[in-house]
């Protein structure tokens, strides 16, 4: 059923080659330069395990109420695509998939950032007031703006 899952996405074009953009997505250490959630908790605890980048690279965090707690793992990494398994443990439990699709265009790279996942009953009821689009959409927009700035100034 369509209402039992969600998909949100945002897109932008970045004046940088695909490989430069890919390098910022494929290495969780690089996310500190552009992630829209960076700065929610100045005392955020970060843990990196697995390879430094690419498939099986893992980033886990634990922070204040705003930052929450969770874990991300890169599950696919190809020249024009990076997929991430995203598990939130707090403040709300959720298991989502994040995809970055990179398309070469004249003068740079077109980037689509999407997030998909199931919506439990509570999320569907909350959706009557606050949709995932409204909750997460602005974060994706902010992240793409910061990714663009970071890639273009590298």
Please name every model-derived segment:
Residues 81-142, 147-149, 153:
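Beta-strand/loop substructures that line and gate deep hydrophobic ligand-binding cavities in soluble
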